[in-house]
């Protein structure tokens, strides 16, 4: 029988705990340590070895009730997450303990820290993933096995858009999904769980939560816990996995809190000096290999609507598609409030999406760009001062802008309007008709919150 390697708590500073070990038993960085905190298991993760045989650790749960001199066990391995079929339909915390009042899984576990796949193992992602959301499919096509970021400030609809993508993709996708709730509202996680149960996708989904009320250690590691489950589905089962992370900014924020507690010098805007490294470690593991793919959708909170903030700016470089949500569009009551001019996708290329799709998308972007340039003239001088050509362009641009809106399935209970999914070919055809002037005699109001262009013609026929 192997000897249990024990240390003792030397100091407690909020979520940071110093543990002294005998020199021959000193744990490695990222090792999980365990102790009994008034009947419940508390996991610590080694972050620094500060000398004098002391391991400085981050707690994965509250440290209330800990005392100096308390015994701590070195598990000699990282935090281990349950993986495989046993996690489907279940809800876990950062350390792999169930939080759905069901028994703990007893099967295979994998460490949350591991290297990213090598270049030789990786596969390219160029297949289009249809979402049924017009503005996304037309202007910001998603790659199957790619990385997608939803950028937006507070209250512009990131979580609703993510839940809509879960509804549209996970339902039609047929594969397995993992949802990691990182530092967001517990209520939203609760709602998501019951919505998934109702729509019969829960048995193909694993959920991992480290929400707002958790200490920074849990919020910093829960994205890795969810990713570990997704990697197992990809590597061992050869699956095309969907990984949803809400919200990746909270991962950075937790890293910043931990960094300050560990006494590191802050860098730009008070973020941790290791920001790019930590983000890279996480993002490089979210990739497609020759065995299977991970398609990830990540919500990214943008502090004070500033896209140049180091946290969202660091995330940008890792993504295939960037969906930017705009407060100005949300204030017009147009949802999803996606900015067509700020959002970009690597896949919007005639060689990938085809010439017809590409040319319609470019024309939509051009007309909206010109419309934006004319806004100041319209505001000062009015529409009458525009040339006939520009006036026609503005009328079409307004129709295009309204037609980019769409009723969502997850907001059905608030809006009372049934959600709609639109096929890509119908989306392309609809915008082509508006741009070619086939809808010039229809008022722009009729284009709000409809699906296909045929729905607009039906609306007009009914109103006559």
Swiss-Prot record:
List the membrane topology term(s): Peripheral membrane protein
Lineage: superkingdom: Bacteria
Listed A to Z, the keywords are:
ATP synthesis, ATP-binding, Cell membrane, CF(1), Hydrogen ion transport, Ion transport, Membrane, Nucleotide-binding, Translocase, Transport
Q: Which GO terms describe its molecular function?
A: ATP binding; ATP hydrolysis activity; proton-transporting ATP synthase activity, rotational mechanism
Catalytic reactions of this protein: ATP + H2O + 4 H(+)(in) = ADP + phosphate + 5 H(+)(out)
Per UniProt, subcellular location reads as: Cell membrane
Cellular component GO terms, alphabetical: plasma membrane; proton-transporting ATP synthase complex
Q: Which residues form the signal peptide?
A: none
Where exactly are the transmembrane stretches of this chain?
none
Give a single Pfam family match.
Answer: ATP-synt_ab
Q: Does the keyword Membrane apply?
A: yes
Which of this chain's residues are annotated to bind ATP?
Answer: 152-159
* Enzyme Commission designation: 7.1.2.2
UniProt lists the family membership as follows:
Belongs to the ATPase alpha/beta chains family.
Function, as annotated, reads: Produces ATP from ADP in the presence of a proton gradient across the membrane. The catalytic sites are hosted primarily by the beta subunits.
Subunit composition?
F-type ATPases have 2 components, CF(1) - the catalytic core - and CF(0) - the membrane proton channel. CF(1) has five subunits: alpha(3), beta(3), gamma(1), delta(1), epsilon(1). CF(0) has three main subunits: a(1), b(2) and c(9-12). The alpha and beta chains form an alternating ring which encloses part of the gamma chain. CF(1) is attached to CF(0) by a central stalk formed by the gamma and epsilon chains, while a peripheral stalk is formed by the delta and b chains.
Q: What is this protein called?
A: ATP synthase subunit beta
Species this protein is from? Ureaplasma urealyticum serovar 10 (strain ATCC 33699 / Western)
């Amino acid at each position: 029988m192997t000897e249990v390697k024990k240390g003792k708590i030397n100091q407690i500073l909020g979520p940071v705990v110093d543990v002294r070990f005998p020199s021959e038993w000193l744990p490695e960085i990222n090792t999980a340590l365990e102790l009994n905190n008034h009947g419940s298991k508390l996991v610590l993760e080694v972050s620094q070895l500060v000398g004098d045989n002391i391991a400085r650790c981050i707690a994965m749960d509250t440290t209330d009730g800990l005392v100096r001199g308390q015994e701590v066990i070195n598990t000699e391995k990282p935090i281990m997450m349950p993986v495989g079929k046993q996690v489907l339909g279940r809800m876990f915390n950062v350390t792999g303990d169930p939080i759905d009042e069901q028994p703990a899984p007893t099967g295979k576990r994998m460490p949350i820290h591991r290297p990213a796949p090598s270049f030789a193992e990786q596969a390219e992602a160029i297949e289009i993933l249809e979402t049924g959301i017009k503005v996304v499919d037309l202007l910001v096509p998603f790659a199957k096995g790619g990385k997608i970021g939803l950028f937006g400030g507070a209250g512009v609809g990131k979580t609703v858009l993510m839940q809509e993508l879960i509804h549209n993709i996970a339902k039609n996708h047929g594969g397995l999904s993992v949802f990691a709730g990182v530092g967001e509202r517990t209520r939203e996680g609760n709602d998501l769980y019951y919505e998934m149960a109702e729509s019969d996708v829960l048995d193909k989904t694993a959920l991992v939560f480290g929400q707002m009320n958790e200490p920074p250690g849990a919020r910093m590691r829960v994205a890795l816990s969810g990713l570990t489950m997704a990697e197992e589905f990809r590597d061992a089962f050869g699956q095309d996995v969907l990984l949803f992370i809400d919200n990746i900014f909270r991962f950075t924020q937790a890293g910043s809190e931990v960094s300050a507690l560990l006494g590191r010098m802050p860098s730009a805007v008070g973020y941790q000096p290791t920001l790019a490294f930590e983000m890279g470690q996480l993002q490089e593991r979210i990739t497609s290999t020759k065995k299977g793919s991970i398609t990830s959708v990540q919500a990214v909170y943008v502090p004070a609507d500033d896209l140049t903030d180091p946290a969202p700016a660091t995330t940008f470089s890792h993504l295939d598609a960037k969906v930017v949500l705009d407060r100005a569009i949300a204030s017009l009551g147009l949802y999803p409030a996606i900015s067509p001019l700020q959002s970009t996708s690597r896949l919007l290329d005639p060689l990938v999406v085809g010439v017809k799709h590409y040319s319609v998308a470019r024309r939509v972007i051009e007309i909206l760009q010109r419309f934006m340039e004319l806004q100041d003239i319209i505001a000062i001088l009015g529409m009458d001062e525009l040339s006939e050509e520009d006036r026609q362009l503005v009328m079409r641009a307004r129709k295009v802008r309204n037609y980019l809106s769409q009723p969502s399935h997850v907001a059905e209970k608030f809006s009372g309007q049934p959600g709609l999914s639109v096929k890509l070919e119908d989306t392309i055809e609809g915008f082509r008709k508006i741009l070619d002037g086939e809808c010039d005699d229809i008022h722009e109001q009729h284009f709000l919150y409809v699906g296909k262009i045929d729905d607009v013609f039906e609306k007009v026929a009914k109103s006559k």
